[in-house]
Swiss-Prot record:
Biased composition (Low complexity): 165-193, 201-213, 235-272, 807-829, 849-860, 867-877, 938-951
Keyword Transcription among record annotations: yes
One GO cellular component, as annotated: host cell nucleus
This protein's encoding gene: IE
Modified how: A long stretch of serine residues may be a major site of phosphorylation.
Lineage: Viruses, Duplodnaviria, Heunggongvirae, Peploviricota, Herviviricetes
Name of this chain's protein: Major viral transcription factor ICP4 homolog
InterPro entries in UniProt: Herpes_ICP4_C, Herpes_ICP4_N
Single GO MF annotation: DNA binding
Regions of compositional bias (Acidic residues) in chain numbering: 214-224
Localisation: Host nucleus
One annotated GO biological process: positive regulation of DNA-templated transcription
Signal recorded as keyword: no
Disulfide bonds: none
Biased composition (Pro residues): 66-75, 273-285
Amino acid sequence: MASQRSDFAPDLYDFIESNDFGEDPLIRAASAAEEGFTQPAAPDLLYGSQNMFGVDDAPLSTPAVVIPPPSPAPEPRGGKAKRSPSAAGSGGPPTPAAAAQPASPAPSPAPGLAAMLKMVHSSVAPGNGRRATGSSSPGGGDAADPVALDSDTETCPGSPQPEFPSSASPGGGSPAPRVRSISISSSSSSSSSMDEDDQADGAGASSSSSSSSDDSDSDEGGEEETPRPRHSQNAAKTPSAAGSPGPSSGGDRPAAGAATPKSCRSGAASPGAPAPAPASAPAPSRPGGGLLPPGARILEYLEGVREANLAKTLERPEPPAGMASPPGRSPHRLPKDQRPKSALAGASKRKRANPRPIPQTQTQAPAEEAPQTAVWDLLDMNSSQATGAAAAAASAPAAASCAPGVYQREPLLTPSGDPWPGSDPPPMGRVRYGGTGDSRDGLWDDPEIVLAASRYAEAQAPVPVFVPEMGDSTKQYNALVRMVFESREAMSWLQNSKLSGQDQNLAQFCQKFIHAPRGHGSFITGSVANPLPHIGDAMAAGNALWALPHAAASVAMSRRYDRTQKSFILQSLRRAYADMAYPRDEAGRPDSLAAVAGYPAQAAAAAASQQQPEAPAPSVRVREAYTRVCAALGPRRKAAAAAAAPGSRAPRPSAFRLRELGDACVLACQAVFEALLRLRGGASAVPGLDPSEIPSPACPPEALCSNPAGLETAALSLYELRDLVERARLLGDSDPTHRLGSDELRLAVRAVLVVARTVAPLVRYNAEGARARASAWTVTQAVFSIPSLVGGMLGEAVSLLAPPTRSQQPSSSSPGGEPFSGSAAAEGSLQTLPPLWPTVPGKQSATVPSSHSQSPQHSQSGGGAGATTATCCRATQTNARSRGQQHQPQKARSPQAAASPAHLSQEAMPGSSSDDRAIHGRPRGKSGKRRSEPLEPAAQAGASASFSSSARGYDPSGPVDSPPAPKRRVATPGHQAPRALGPMPAEGPDRRGGFRRVPRGDCHTPRPSDAACAAYCPPELVAELIDNQLFPEAWRPALTFDPQALATIAARCSGPPARDGARFGELAASGPLRRRAAWMHQIPDPEDVKVVVLYSPLQDEDLLGGLPASRPGGSRREPLWSDLKGGLSALLAALGNRILTKRSHAWAGNWTGAPDVSALNAQGVLLLSTGDLAFTGCVEYLCLRLGSARRKLLVLDAVSTEDWPQDGPAISQYHIYMRAALTPRVACAVRWPRERHLSRAVLTSSTLFGPGLFARAEAAFARLYPDSAPLRLCRSSNVAYTVDTRAGERTRVPLAPREYRQRVLPDYDGCKDMRAQAEGLGFHDPDFEEGAAQSHRAANRWGLGAWLRPVYLACGRRGAGAVEPSELLIPELLSEFCRVALLEPDAEAEPLVLPITEAPRRRAPRVDWEPGFGSRSTSVLHMGATELCLPEPDDELEIDGAGDVELVVEHPGPSPGVAQALRRAPIKIEVVSDDEDGGDWCNPYLS
C-alpha cells in the first residue's frame, strides 16, 4: 500500500505549511477520524486515505508524558531525554543519563497539532542529529523482556533503519530483507470496541480490519529491498537500560526507504542486543542538506505517545472471581465480555498480537551480557508471550532462548494469539460439519450411528469411518497419529481403507444422508477422508499434532503425486511432527509426560505410569528368582502329610499335564542358556558351568508329580532370569544399572541347574521331545521347508500356536486333559509361558531317530511322559499338504504330494478306533486324504517291537487333520489286511523290498528326509502288490523304489483275495489309478529311456485326455486355464513348436482325446508328471539303472519350486540336470494381447522351457549318444492332438491332406447345393484360425489343423521377465519382421530363433498362393480379429499403404468384405459327380 511505503511524506512540515493548515482544522480532522467519519478534503489526506494512524493508536487526549503506575512502566518512545555531551559530540558510546521526571498528565491538556509541530521543530538543535527518546539511560531495550524490541520492528516513514546483530537473522549471508513498514488500522470507530483477537485476525473472522489485508499486501509485494547498514563496533558496546520499550539509544530511527528485516517482526532481535545504529553516524537530512525532516520528528513523537498509552493500558488485569486463565494462554486473553475496554484502546494490530506485561523490576545489564535469542517467525506467535516474559524477568537466559526442536506445549492459536474462529462448541443438537463454524443436525438416534458408536468405543485402532455422533474425537485423532507414524501404508489406508460390512453400511449412510444433501463433491466438509474427524475439533483444542492426519490424507487424495513422491511427503511429515509426537527432555531422552502435556487423557495415563513404583535392581531380582525356584521345587511337607493321612485323597494332575510342564521347564532352561551364551560370548566364559558345581535335585520325582504349580513357577522364574540377562546384554553398556556381575550370573546358572536336575526324571532324561515342541522351532521348520509346503506349514503353525488368553485359570485348577498354553503364575502375575506345540491328550507318540543318543531308559519306555519326542515338522508338513491340496483333487491323490505318517499307519489298520478320526474336534472333510496316501513311517523306527503288535495307530506329536475313515472292505470273516509299510529292519533292507534308493554324494534336487528313507515294505508284500496287469513287467522294479506308491496300491486292494494265500484283496483299477499309471506305456523298455522330462500338470491335465463333461458322453472335467503357470499343455506346445492360447488346439480344454507323443517316445524321451504313480521311484530307478551301466540320464525339469513334492526324487550330480520355467506367458499373444505385431512371436531364453533350453539339451544328447540320431525337441511332428473339427469330433490334427480328402470329400459327393458345399468345406473360413489351418485350401495344402510356426525372440534372462514390450528394446526392423512374417506349417522345420538385440538379416517369410487357388492374400483369425497377410511380391506395391498386414474386422469370423473378396476369385471344388461335367475351374487341388 502507498501508506506503508517508506518514502511517504518526506516533509510533513512543509506539506502542512504549503497547504495553510491551521491547528483547528487538524484537530477537527483527527477528532472526526476518531469518531469514524471520513473528511472530504485535506484532512482525509493526512488521516483517512493514507492509513498512517488509526484512532486507537494515538487519541488526541493522550498526554505527552504519562505518569507510570505503581509498577514501573516503560518510558514512551516520544519522551525527551538529553544526550551526554560526549555521546553527542564525539560519537562514542553514550553514557547513562538520569531518567527525566515525567509531569502529571492531569492538569495539562493536549496541545494542538500545529503547536506540537512548532515545538518539535524548535527543539531540534543544529548539528545534533536526533535526541535520545524515552529512556532513562542510553541503550534502550529490556534485557528481561523478549519483546522489548517489538516497537523497533514497526518503523515509520522518515526514520533510519537500525542495525541488527548477526544472531537476529537466520543466515549471515542471506540477502537484504524486504521492507516491512508499519501496519496501523484505520477502521471505523466500531473497530475500537472490537477485541484485539478478532481485529488482528485477518483470515478467520469476517470483521477483521483492513489493516490485516494491508499488512499481508506489504509482506508479499508492497515492500522494497535495501542493503543492510554495516554493523558498528561502537554500537556493540552500548549498554542498555532495562525496562525501556523504546528504541535503543545511540541508534537512529530508520530512514526513509530503509528496510526492516522480516525476521524481527515479532521481536526476533535480542532484547539486550547491541545498539543497532552507530552513535557517530550522521543524522539523515533532506536531499538539499540540513536537518532531519520535521515530518519524521512528528511521526516519532506521535509514536512515543502511543507507546506510553499502550504501556498504561496493557497492565495485567485481575481476572474475575472464579475465572482462571486457561493453561498455556496469556492471562490477557480473556473472553470478550470479561475484558476491560481500556485494554483494547490504543493498541495497534502488532501490539495486540504480542501483549507485554509490565515488568516489575528494572535492572540494567550491559549489552554484551544479554543472551542472543533465536529468530521468531510468525508461526511462533501462537505461544504465550506474556508467560515467557514473566519467566524471563526471573531468569533472562532461560526466557531469551528458544531451544530448537523442543515443542512448546501450548495450544496452537491464530497468529494474533486468539482461539481459532469456529472453536466454540456447536449449538445444542448439532455437530460440526462443513466450513469454519458450520454445523449440521446430529443423528444420534439413527441405528447405524448407534452401532458405529459402540464399535468406536471398543476399537483399539482408528475406525475407517468416523462421524461426530460416535463420541469424542480425541481417541480417533490419537489413533490416527499413531497409525501415521507406525503404519507403512498409512496414506493408502487413509484414502482407501478396507471397509467391513458394517463400516460399508455406515459409509453409504453418510453419503446418502450427510454428504449428498449438501451439494457437490467439492463441498467443504472439514475432512478429506472418512476416518478423519472434523478439523474443527483440532482447532478448538489447539492441538497442532491433530493436523498431521489431515495433511497426510490431503496428500494421499492428491493426484499430482505418484506413490514414491507421496511416500517422501509422508516421511517429511513424520520428521516434522516427530518432536511433537515423541518429545524429549533436555538430556535428549523420551519425555512421556511432556508428550502428552497438552492432552488431558494422555497426561493422566502417563502420570499414572510414572507413579508406578520403581523396579528393584537386577541383582536383587536375580536373587529373588533363585529363591522362588528353590521354594517352588522344594519338598512340601504339609502337602505330603495331607496326602499320607488316612482317608484322604489329594487330586493328582494327569500325566499329560506333567509332560507339558516338563517340556516347558526344559525350554525355559534352554532360553536362559542361550541368553547367557550371547551375553558372555561362549560357554567357557559363563560362571557356574563347572561339573563340580552341579547341584542335586530339589525334590524326588514322586513329589514333583504332585506339584504342577511349582513347575510352572519355576519356569516363569527362569524366563524372568532370561529377560534380566538379555537386558544386561542390550542395555548394560549404556546403563550400568542393568549390568550383571559374575555372582549374579553364577546364581542364574545355579537356578537353571536346579530346575534341570529336578525335572530331568520327569522328561526321562531326554530333551528331544521338548525341543520338538518349541513353538519358535516349529515356525523355523516351517519357513525353511521346500517352496511347495512353506505356505501351508507356516499357516498351520500360526493357527495352532494361538496366543494364550489372559483370563485362564491358574495351572492348579486347569483340567489335566487340556494342552498347556501358559497360565498365571502362583503369585498372581500376568506372565505366561510361551505356547508349546500342542499334542494329543492321552496318546503315545513314538520316537524319531536322531543323532542325539538316547538313554536305555528312554528307549525302552515305549510310552509315558518322555515318549513325546517326534519332530513336529512331520505333522506340520502333513497337515499343510493335505489342506493346501484339497482344492486340487487330482493332485491330492498322488502319494508324493499328499503323504503323511499319520495316514500311513492308520490306513493299514482297519481296527483303528473312531477316536483317531477326529483330533481336537476337527472332523475329516469330504475331500480329505485317502487311506492310500501315507507318509513315511520312519517316525516309528524306534518302536519296532510295538509296531507289529500294537493295534493303535501312529499319532504324530502335533495335531493334524485325522485320516479319513477306512473304506468298507469286502473281506472274509476274520481276515485282516496287513500293513504294507513298516520300519527299516535293523539288519538292513532286502534288495527285493520296497524302499528308497538315495544315491550317495551331492544331488541336484533336495534329498529326502530321514523318515522317507526309513519306510520299508517287505519283499513278499512287494511281489504281491506289483503283480498286476496294470503295471508292465519292465517297469515294476520302479514301483519298488517308491514305498509311497506301494502304500497307494495296497490301499486300493479292497476286493476279495485274488487267490488262496493272498494277503491283500484284488486290486480295483479305477480310472484315476489308470491315468496315473499311463506313463509306463510310453516307452516299453526302460533301457531305451535317454531323456526324462519332468512337469507338474494343471488340474485335470493328463496324457489320456478324453471328452470334457460338457459334451455328451464326456466324463473329464474341463481343465483350468492359467496365464502364469504352465502345465502339460504348455509343455507339449513348446515341444511341438507352436503357440499356446486358450482357443488353440494346444490347450487341454479343447482336447477330445489323448495327445499323441509317440514321436518323442521314439527318440527316448519320457514325459513324467509329479502326479504319476511312482514318480519318485521312476526317476531314482532310471538314475540307478543308467548309472550302473555307466550312462548318464538327461533330465529336463519343468516343475516349479512351489510344486516340487516333498521327499521328491534325488537326482545325483552324475547325471545331467537342466531346469527351466514353464509358463504360457512366453507367447507374446498371452503376455501382451494388444500388441498385434507380436501375436506370432514367442520369447525364449536358457531359463525358459523352449528352444533355448532345447538347444542345450540337444548338444548334451549329441555328446552322450554320438552314434544315435540327433535329438529334435522343438518340431511340429513331435506332438499331435485329438480335437473336434469338421472332419469329426475326435480328429487327430494335423490331419494329412490325403487323409483329409478321404474323410471330408465323400460327404459332398453328388451334392448340388453349392452353398452347402462351401460351408461344409470352409471355403469362406479364414485360412488359419488361432494358428491352425482351417480353410479348405489350407487343409488341402498342409493338412487340417496344421499350425503356423512362431518366431522365437531370444530375449535373455532379463527379457524373460519383461512386463511391457518397451522393456525388450526390440529394434524397429525386427518388430516389422514379426508383424509381416508368416511361417507356413512344416513338420520337420527347426525353430526360427532371432536375437532380440539385432535386426534380422533375412527377409520375412511369407505364404504365397499359386494362381487358381483363390486370393493371393492369406487370412489369419486371431483373438477375434482377421488379418490379411499379403505375399512377398506385393510388398513393394504397398509401401505407402497400410502395410502388409491389414486389420479388416474386429469381431470373430470373416468379414463380409473378406468373403466377397474370396468369392471374386475362381473357386475350384473337387467333387465326385456322375451327372455333371466338372471343369478344372472348380478343382482347388490341381497344381
